[in-house]
């Protein structure tokens, strides 16, 4: 933990390949990097527990709590219940970085972002893509997830299959 600054990791590659290219990434690099840092520390805590390394369990648990606190303080808009973008909200939900009780509201913030900013389409890159469906459906927005996955037109899953011939979906 010598590289992060006050438990925030300020560098990384970010949420690559959103619609419009990497210059349109709207999930802050520090947010995605810090979320992965939290995830990695969570894994280390589990490994230490399996190995019965009590001191390491305590260390990683304490570090995880510090990262969580810093993450929420740095990135969470408590008033609007969002981390600011579809990917940011989906990652926070997936990694358990949303304040307890706010999960449904953060999921709704994803749907609201899609509706208000992106004409009901995704605006996510590689980190959001695998998380967006569960972030919507697990927390009461299954209808929005269904609409998203069955929508047609550019920047849709149907477009990736039929027109873009995206091999990653096959």
Predicted regions and their residues:
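Active-site core of glycosidic bond-cleaving carbohydrate-active enzymes
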Residues: 1-170
